[in-house]
Curated annotation (Swiss-Prot):
It is an enzyme of class 2 (transferase). SUPFAM superfamilies: beta and beta-prime subunits of DNA dependent RNA-polymerase (SSF64484). The keyword Transcription applies. Keywords: DNA-directed RNA polymerase, Nucleotidyltransferase, Transcription, Transferase. HAMAP family: RNApol_bact_RpoB. It comes from Pseudomonas putida. The RNAP catalytic core consists of 2 alpha, 1 beta, 1 beta' and 1 omega subunit. When a sigma factor is associated with the core the holoenzyme is formed, which can initiate transcription. Belongs to the RNA polymerase beta chain family. One of its GO terms (cellular component) is DNA-directed RNA polymerase complex. InterPro entries: DNA-dir_RNA_pol_bsu_ext_1_sf, DNA-dir_RNA_pol_bsu_external_1, DNA-dir_RNA_pol_su2, DNA-dir_RNAP_su2_dom, DNA-dir_RNAP_su2_hyb_sf, RNA_pol_bsu_bac, RNA_pol_bsu_CS, RNA_pol_bsu_protrusion. Pfam families: RNA_pol_Rpb2_1, RNA_pol_Rpb2_2, RNA_pol_Rpb2_3, RNA_pol_Rpb2_45, RNA_pol_Rpb2_6, RNA_pol_Rpb2_7. This is DNA-directed RNA polymerase subunit beta.
Length: 1357
C-alpha cells in the first residue's frame, strides 16, 4: 500500500475487518457537478447537449413578433472572465461572477412575398447580465459573503395515487385520489367523495365532476361509458327476457330463480349465493343464455340510448336507470335488445356512471364554460376564451411540461412500456389515470407511498439556477415580442431589442435571497462540508414546517444508503432537512442512488452498480458485513438481507447485490463518531449535530480515537492545501508555498511553477479564525493529492475539531451535577480550548443633506488618551490592543443649524467655526469586547480623494503583487538555464560572448558568463543555436506575460471601489479576540454527551492516579446509563490504550532505542491485534523514527462505524500498553490525598468546545431602548434589552406580599415613563426616592377598549 506524504508521518491504526471495495467518493461532487453541467463552460457551442443553460435559451427562443414578420433566434453563448478572484471579491464585498454574452440573430421577413422570404439578417452578441461562478469548494461569493445553495428534495413529477387514510369522513371510509404533478404547469387532481362520485380539481380550486373534464376533452356520455364499463346484453321477445350470459359476472349474486343447464338439470337453486364452483359448472355446461324475470333488469343502468325501432324516438338516454315505467314503454315499442352497464359492489362499482348522473353539462361547450367559470370566477365566458384557457392548461408546451422524468414516471405508473413521450398531456393520458384510479377503488392495484425515495427527487443548484434563468428569460420574451414589430421600421439591432435586466434580476434574487441560498456555516471544515451535502424538503415548491406531518419526517426504508437516518436537526425541522449518505449520488433524473457490489450465485464480485430506490426494490441485498470465505463466497446458510424494502433472511444463492461498505448508511458527520453502533440513535443525532458547532482551537489536536473518515473530510472540504501537480518544494514560509513542478507533470505551454498563497488569520462567516500552516519543508518531494498545509481544525491533513482530554467518570463534590463538567486549571494554562474569534466592524461615511460625514482624527470633546491609537487619518493602527468603548475610526457628522444661545456665540467667537458644527459618530469597540486590531481595509468611492491610510494600504498591496510573479519568473528562468547548461556542456563554440572559436563549454566557462551573455553564444551545431534562440524567446515571452499580469492586478488595486449610492468611504476594522475556556461555556463529546463547564479547579485539587497524574476533566457517570450512549465509554478505554502506547514509544525514544526495536514494537501495535495490516517494511529507518516521534502523544486509532474495534481488541491494546484491562484505576482526591473507595474509569475522550460561549451570551442593562407602543424595555442582547418580569414572577412577589418591590417592578422599572425619568434624575442627584405614576400599558388598554367602541375614561377625584 502506498502512503501519502502526510500519512507516512502518522499512521492511524485501523480496526476495520472489511476490505475497502470502493473509496468514499468526492464529497462535494453533488454541488460541483451540478453547476458545471449548468454552465457547460468548457463545451464547444455548436455541440452543446440540450441541457441546463442551453436548454433554457432553446425553450424561449426563437421569439417571433405578433405579426410574424420578424424573429429573434438564439445562436449560442459564451462566458467571460471574472473581474476579481475569490479573495478579492470577499474583501471588496462584491459577487464572484462572470459576464454572459449571448449571440442572437435577428431575421426580418419580406412582408410582400407570399412564402416568407428572408429580407434581412443581423447577428450580434448581447450582454445578458452576470452569472455567479461557483468556487472550487462548492460555494458562491455573493456580495462578499460565502453562500451555499442547499439541494431541495421535492415530489417527483408524474402521477400519484393515494387515499386519505379515512380522516376526511366521519365513517372512516377511504377516499381515493390521483394527482398529476408536472414539472411546471397546473396540477390535476381526481378524487372520490363519500358518495363514491369522482371529482376533478385544477390547481386545487373548486371541484367539478370528473365527467366535465372528459366532456371538455370531446368525449360523449356513451363513449365515456364504453371506455370504463363492459355491458350486459338483454334480449326481449314478448313477455320473456333473456340475458347473454358471461358466467364470471354472476359471482357473489343471489340467484333470483333456478338456473338450469340445457338438459334441465338445476345448477343453482333459487335464493342461493352463486360461488366459484357454480360458475365452473355453468362454464362446463356451456350455458350461453339465461332466462330472467322482467324485474331482473330493474335498477340497472342503460349503456346505450334505447331507440323506438319504428319512429326512431329516443325512449331513454344512455346512463338512465331502468324503472318499471320505462320497461313498460320498451315492451310496448317492441324493442328487442337492451344493453346495460355491468356493475357490482365487489370489483366494478358504478362510480363513473354516478358521476355522469350528477353532471349538469351535456356537451363539450358547456363543459368548457364550466371549467372557465371555475378558473376565472366573475369573468364572462366566451367560446374562444374557454377553449384557449382549457388548451393552455394541459396541452400547451409553453405553459405545461411534465419533463422527460415526469413522462417516464407517468408512463411507468399507468403500465405503459415506453418511457419517452410528449411533455404535455393527451386525452388518453387523462383517461388512463381515471381508469387506474377507478381500478384502485375497485380493489385492483395499490396506492403509492409518497415518502418512497422513488417518488421524491433531489433538485440541485444547477437545476434551480436554470429554472430561475428561464423565469427571467420569459419576462424578457414578453418585452422583446412587443419591440420586434418595430425592428424593421426603425432598423433596430438585437442589442436594442433585448433588455437583460429581468434575467439579471431573477438570477440575483435567487442567489441573494432564495430560501435555499444560505449563509454558509463556516464554523469548521465539517460544518462546511455538511452544509453543502444537505437536502431540504423546505423552500419554494416544497413543504412548509407547519404542514409537514410525521410520515414525511420519518425514516423510510428507501433512505438506506441514500439519506442519513441519524443526522437531522432537532426541533421544528426534524426530518425535513437531511444529509446525504457518504456514498450517495444523484442520477440523471435527480433520484438518489446508492452503490452495490454485484453477487452472482453466492459469489461476490468487485463490480459496482449504482441503483435508485425503484431499481433496487426487486433485488435481494446482503449487508457489507456478511461472512465470506477467501474465494468471496457467502458462507452463512441464511444471509441477512433487504428485499422489497423489508429486512429478512435468504439463502446465499438468492442474493443479487451486496452493500459496498458498512458506513454507506450514514452521513459524513455520523461516520466520524467512533463506536456509533453502541450509541442510542437520539444521542448519535445530537453528536453528529454538535460536531458541526465545534470551534477551531488554537492548536488542532487529532482525535486519538477516530473512524478513518477524518482524512477524507479534511481533504475534500477544500480547507487544506492539496497538491495539484507533483514536484519539489522550492521555498516555503508561513504565508506561501512555492513548488517546482516535476517535468513529467508539465504539458507544453503550462506553468512550471505552482504558488500556493496561504490564508492567514481571516474571518469566517461565524467569526471563527481561518489560518493555514505549512506542513512541508524546503526540498521535500510531494506527489499530486498530498496535503501541504493544515488549516484551523485540521492536524496533518486529518480533521481535528477538539482536544484529547484525560477524563474520569466519577461524581465529585457535586461539581458535575446535571451534566455539568468540572475542568482542571491545567486545561486553561496549556490553552487547550483557547479559541481565536475575528470580528469585523464597519464604519460607513455617507453624503448627508447637511454635508458629507468625515473620517478624521479631529473629533470634538474627546481627550488625547482616546485618540492615541488613531493615525492622522483617524483610523486605528494595526496591532493596537483595544477594549470596550475605544475609538476605532473617528467620524464626525454635520449638525443641523439651530438658534445659538449667547454662551455658544461667545464660544464660537473664541474657538472658531468647526468645534460645534459637528457631532461625534465614531466607530467604537462594542461592550464586552477586548481584542487586537489585525487588519484594516479602506474602500473609497471613485473620484473621492484617498486619505493617507488608504494610500499606505494600496502601496503595501502593490508591493506584494510582484513577489509571486518574480518568484515564478526566477524558477522558470532557473529551470531554462538548467536545461541549457546540460545541453551546452561539452559542446564547441563558434564565437560570441567573448569566447574564441573552438572553445569547449564547461561549467566554469558558463559560470563566468552573465545570464544575458549565454544567448550571444554562437554554437557549432545549428540545433543548439536554435535551442538558445527558443529559450531566449521563451524567457522574454514569460516576462511579458508576467508584466501584463502585474499591470492587470495593479489596475484592480488602484481603481476606485464600487460602493452603494451615497457612500463615500467604508472602513473595515478586524479585531482578533482570544477566548479562553471559562465556566458557562458549552462542551461536548462526539456521542451527544454535552454539558456546561461548572467550575475550573486548581490542578493540585483534581483527582489523580497512583503516579500523581491528575485528570483534566471529571464527568458524571449518571449521564451514561439513561442516555444509552455507551460509545463514549469504549472511546475512553481505547483512548487510554492509544495514549499508553504513545507514552511507551516516548520512553523508547528517550532511552534512544534503535530503529529496528521501534520497528518491531510498531509492527506489534499495527499488525498483531486485529484490523488492517500496515506495511512498515517500505519505511526507511529515518521514516520509522519520524513516525515514532509523531506517535509520542498517542497512537491514533480508527474504529470505523459498524466495523470497529471489538471488546477483546480494546483489552489487548490496553495490555500491550501495560495498563489494566478493565480500563479502571484507583484515584486519590487531590485535596485530601484520600483514596476513592472504588476504581474509576479513566481514559482519553475527544472533547469539543461548542460555539455557545458565555461571553457571547452574557449581557446586562441599566437603561436602554423601549418598545414604541407599550413603552416597556425591549428584550434580548441584540436590542440591548432587559429581563422580562413575567406573570409567574409577579405571582411570586404577590405571594410574598412584597408590595413595594412589586410596585417598583410594574411601574418605574418598566413602563411608567414619567416615573422612570424622574427616578433616574433623583439617583443622579443622590436622592433614592421614587414616585410611581400611571403605567403606559394601562393607557394602551384604554385605547384598545376605545377601539372596540366602548368609551372609557379615568375619573379624577
Amino acid at each position: 500500500m502506498a502512503y501519502s506524504y502526510t500519512e507516512k508521518k502518522r499512521i492511524r491504526k485501523d480496526f476495520s475487518k472489511l476490505p475497502d471495495v470502493m473509496d468514499v467518493p468526492y464529497l462535494l461532487a453533488i454541488q460541483l457537478d451540478s453547476y458545471r453541467e449548468f454552465l457547460q463552460a468548457g463545451s464547444i457551442q455548436g455541440s452543446l447537449p440540450r441541457r441546463r443553460l442551453h436548454a433554457a435559451f432553446k425553450s424561449v427562443f426563437p421569439i417571433i413578433s405578433y405579426s410574424g414578420n420578424a424573429a429573434l433566434e438564439y445562436v449560442g453563448y459564451r462566458l467571460g472572465e471574472p473581474a476579481f478572484d475569490v479573495k478579492e471579491c470577499v474583501l471588496r464585498g462584491v459577487t464572484f461572477a462572470v459576464p454572459l454574452r449571448v449571440k442572437v440573430r435577428l431575421i426580418i421577413f419580406d412582408k410582400e412575398s407570399s412564402n416568407k422570404a428572408i429580407k434581412d439578417i443581423k447577428e450580434q452578441e448581447v450582454y445578458m447580465g452576470e452569472i455567479p461562478l461557483m468556487t472550487e469548494n462548492g460555494t458562491f461569493v455573493i456580495n462578499g459573503t460565502e453562500r451555499v445553495i442547499v439541494s431541495q428534495m421535492h415530489r417527483s413529477p408524474g402521477v400519484f395515487f393515494d387515499h386519505d387514510r379515512g380522516k376526511t369522513h366521519s365513517s372512516g371510509k377511504l377516499l381515493y385520489s390521483a394527482r398529476i404533478i408536472p414539472y411546471r404547469g397546473s396540477w390535476l387532481d381526481f378524487e372520490f367523495d363519500p358518495k363514491d362520485c369522482v371529482f376533478v380539481r385544477i390547481d386545487r380550486r373548486r371541484k367539478l365532476p370528473a365527467s366535465v373534464l372528459l366532456r371538455a376533452l370531446g368525449y360523449s356520455t356513451e363513449e365515456v361509458l364504453n371506455t370504463f364499463y363492459t355491458t350486459n346484453v338483454f334480449h326481449i321477445s314478448g313477455e320473456k327476457l333473456s340475458l347473454e350470459l358471461v358466467p364470471q359476472r354472476l359471482a357473489g349474486e343471489v340467484a333470483v330463480m333456478d338456473i338450469h343447464d340445457e338438459t334441465g338439470k338445476v345448477i343453482v337453486e333459487q335464493g342461493r349465493r352463486i360461488t366459484a364452483r357454480h360458475i365452473n359448472q355453468l362454464e362446463k355446461a356451456g350455458v350461453k343464455q339465461l332466462d330472467v324475470p322482467m324485474e331482473y333488469v330493474l335498477g340497472r343502468t342503460t349503456a346505450k340510448a334505447i331507440v323506438h325501432p319504428a319512429t326512431g324516438e329516443i325512449l331513454a338516454e344512455c346512463n338512465t336507470e331502468m324503472t318499471t315505467e320505462l320497461l313498460i314503454k320498451v315492451a310496448k315499442a317492441q324493442v328487442v335488445r337492451i344493453e346495460t352497464l355491468y356493475t357490482n359492489d365487489i370489483d366494478c362499482g358504478p362510480f363513473i356512471s354516478d358521476t355522469l348522473k350528477i353532471d349538469t353539462t351535456s356537451n363539450q361547450l358547456e363543459a368548457l364554460v364550466e371549467i372557465y367559470r371555475m378558473m376565472r370566477p366573475g369573468e364572462p365566458p366566451t367560446k374562444d376564451a374557454a377553449e384557449t384557457l382549457f388548451n393552455n392548461l394541459f396541452f400547451s408546451a409553453e405553459r405545461y411540461d411534465l419533463s422527460p422524468l415526469g413522462r417516464m414516471k407517468f408512463n411507468r405508473r399507468i403500465g405503459r412500456t415506453e418511457i419517452e413521450g410528449s411533455g404535455v398531456l393527451s386525452k388518453e393520458d387523462i383517461v388512463e389515470v381515471l381508469k387506474t384510479l377507478v381500478d384502485i377503488r375497485n380493489g385492483k392495484g395499490i396506492v403509492d407511498d409518497i415518502d418512497h425515495l422513488g417518488n421524491r427527487r433531489v433538485r440541485c443548484v444547477g437545476e434551480m439556477a436554470e429554472n430561475q434563468f428561464r423565469v427571467g428569460l420569459v419576462r424578457v420574451e414578453r418585452a422583446v415580442k412587443e419591440r420586434l414589430s418595430m425592428a424593421e421600421s426603425e432598423g433596430l439591432m438585437p442589442q436594442d431589442l433585448i433588455n437583460a435586466k429581468p434575467v439579471a434580476a431573477a438570477v440575483k434574487e435567487f442567489f441573494g435571497s432564495s430560501q435555499l441560498s444560505q449563509f454558509m456555516d463556516q464554523n469548521n471544515p465539517l460544518s462546511e462540508i455538511t452544509h453543502k451535502r444537505r437536502c431540504s424538503a423546505l423552500g419554494p415548491g416544497g413543504l412548509t414546517r407547519e404542514r409537514a406531518g410525521f410520515e414525511v419526517r420519518d425514516v423510510h426504508p428507501t433512505h438506506y444508503g441514500r439519506v442519513c437516518p441519524i443526522e437531522t436537526p432537532e426541533g421544528p425541522n426534524i426530518g425535513l432537512i437531511n444529509s446525504l449518505a457518504a456514498y450517495a449520488r444523484t442520477n440523471q433524473y435527480g433520484f438518489l442512488e446508492s452503490p452495490y457490489r454485484v453477487v452472482k450465485e453466492g459469489v461476490v464480485s468487485d463490480d459496482i452498480v449504482f441503483l435508485s430506490a425503484i431499481e433496487e426494490a426487486d433485488h435481494v441485498i446482503a449487508q457489507a458485513s456478511a461472512a465470506m470465505n477467501d474465494k468471496k463466497q457467502l458462507i452463512d446458510e441464511l444471509v441477512a438481507v433487504r428485499h422489497l424494502n423489508e429486512f429478512t433472511v435468504k439463502a446465499p444463492e438468492d442474493v443479487t447485490l451486496m452493500d459496498v461498505s458498512p458506513k454507506q448508511v450514514v452521513s459524513v458527520a455520523a461516520s466520524l463518531i467512533p463506536f456509533l453502533e453502541h450509541d442510542d440513535a437520539n444521542r448519535a443525532l445530537m453528536g453528529s449535530n454538535m460536531q458541526r458547532q465545534a470551534v477551531p482551537t488554537l492548536r488542532a489536536d487529532k482525535p486519538l480515537v477516530g473512524t478513518g473518515m477524518e482524512r477524507n473530510v479534511a481533504r475534500d472540504s477544500g480547507v487544506c492545501v492539496v497538491r495539484r501537480r507533483g514536484g519539489v518544494i522550492d521555498s516555503v514560509d508561513a504565508s506561501r508555498i512555492v513548488v517546482r513542478v516535476a517535468d513529467d507533470e508539465v504539458e507544453t505551454g503550462e506553468r512550471r511553477v505552482d504558488i500556493y498563497n496561504l490564508t492567514k488569520y481571516t474571518r469566517s462567516n461565524q467569526n471563527t479564525c481561518i489560518n493555514q500552516r505549512p506542513l512541508v519543508s524546503k526540498g521535500d518531494k510531494v506527489q499530486r493529492g498530498d496535503i501541504m498545509a493544515d488549516r484551523a481544525s485540521t492536524d496533518m491533513g486529518e480533521l481535528a475539531l477538539g482536544q484529547n482530554m484525560r477524563i474520569a467518570f466519577m461524581a465529585w463534590n457535586g461539581f458535575n451535577f446535571e451534566d455539568s463538567i468540572c475542568l482542571s486549571e491545567r486545561v486553561v494554562q496549556e490553552d487547550r480550548f483557547t479559541t481565536i474569534h475575528i470580528q469585523e466592524l464597519t464604519c460607513v461615511a455617507r453624503d448627508n443633506k447637511l454635508g458629507p460625514r468625515e473620517i478624521t482624527s479631529g473629533i470634538p470633546n474627546v481627550g488625547e488618551a482616546a485618540l492615541n491609537k488613531l493615525d492622522e487619518a483617524g483610523i486605528v493602527y494595526v496591532g493596537a490592543e483595544v477594549g470596550a468603548g475605544d475609538i476605532l475610526v473617528g467620524k464626525v457628522t454635520p449638525k443641523g443649524h439651530t438658534q445659538l444661545t449667547p454662551e455658544e456665540k461667545l464660544l464660537r467667537a473664541i474657538f472658531g467655526e468647526k468645534a460645534s458644527d459637528v457631532k461625534d459618530t465614531s466607530l467604537r469597540v462594542p461592550t464586552g469586547t477586548q481584542g487586537t486590531v489585525i487588519d484594516v481595509q479602506v474602500f473609497t468611492r471613485d473620484g473621492v480623494e484617498r486619505d493617507s491610510r488608504a494610500l499606505a494600504i494600496e502601496k503595501m498591496q502593490l508591493d506584494e503583487i510582484p513577489q509571486d510573479l518574480n518568484e515564478e519568473f526566477r524558477i522558470v528562468e532557473g529551470a531554462t538555464f538548467e536545461r541549457l547548461r546540460s545541453a551546452l556542456n561539452g559542446q564547441v563554440v563558434d564565437g560570441g560572448a567573448g569566447l574564441k572559436k573552438g572553445t569547449v563549454i564547461t561549467d566554469e566557462v558558463l559560470d563566468g558568463l552573465d545570464d544575458g551573455q549565454w544567448f550571444k553564444l554562437r554554437m557549432a551545431e545549428d540545433a543548439l543555436n536554435e535551442q538558445l534562440e527558443k529559450a531566449q524567446q521563451y524567457i522574454v515571452d514569460r516576462r511579458r506575460l508576467l508584466d501584463d499580469k502585474f499591470e492587470d492586478k495593479k489596475r484592480n488595486v488602484q481603481q476606485g471601489d464600487d460602493l452603494a449610492p451615497g457612500v463615500l468611504k467604508i472602513v473595515k476594522v478586524y479585531l482578533a479576540i482570544r477566548r479562553r475556556i471559562q465556566p458557562g461555556d458549552k462542551m461536548a463529546g462526539r456521542h451527544g454527551n454535552k454539558g456546561v463547564v461548572s467550575v475550573i479547579m486548581p490542578v493540585e485539587d483534581m483527582p489523580h492516579d497512583a503516579n500523581g497524574t491528575p485528570v483534566d476533566v471529571v464527568l458524571n457517570p449518571l449521564g451514561v446509563p439513561s442516555r444509552m450512549n455507551v460509545g463514549q465509554i469504549l472511546e475512553t478505554h481505547l483512548g487510554l490504550a492509544a495514549k499508553g502506547l504513545g507514552e511507551k514509544i516516548d520512553r523508547m525514544l528517550e532511552e534512544q532505542r534503535k530503529a529496528a526495536e521501534l520497528r518491531v514494537f510498531l509492527t506489534e501495535v499495527y499488525n498483531e491485534i486485529g484490523g488492517r495490516q500496515e506495511n512498515l517494511d517500505e519505511f526507511t529507518d529515518e521514516e520509522i523514527l519520524a513516525l515514532a516521534n509523531n506517535l509520542k502523544k498517542g497512537v491514533p486509532m480508527a474504529t470505523p462505524v459498524f466495523d470497529g474495534a471489538k471488546e477483546r481488541e480494546i483489552k489487548a491494546m490496553l495490555k500491550l500498553a501495560d495498563l489494566p484491562e478493565s480500563g479502571q484505576m484507583v484515584l486519590f482526591d487531590g485535596r485530601t490525598r484520600n483514596k476513592f473507595e472504588r476504581p474509576v474509569t479513566v481514559g482519553y475522550m475527544y472533547m469539543l468546545k461548542l460555539n455557545h460561549l458565555v461571553d457571547d451570551k452574557m449581557h446586562a442593562r441599566s437603561t436602554g431602548s423601549y418598545s414604541l407602543v407599550t413603552q416597556q424595555p425591549l428584550g434580548g442582547k441584540a436590542q440591548f434589552g432587559g429581563q422580562r418580569f413575567g406573570e409567574m414572577e409577579v405571582w411570586a412577589l404577590e405571594a410574598y406580599g412584597a408590595a413595594y418591590t412589586l410596585q417598583e417592578m410594574l411601574t418605574v422599572k418598566s413602563d411608567d415613563v414619567n416615573g422612570r425619568t424622574k427616578m433616574y434624575k433623583n439617583i443622579v442627584d443622590g436622592d433614592h426616592r421614587m414616585e410611581p405614576g400611571m403605567a403606559e400599558s394601562f393607557n394602551v388598554l384604554i385605547k384598545e377598549i376605545r377601539s372596540l367602541g366602548i368609551d372609557i375614561d379615568l375619573e379624577t377625584e
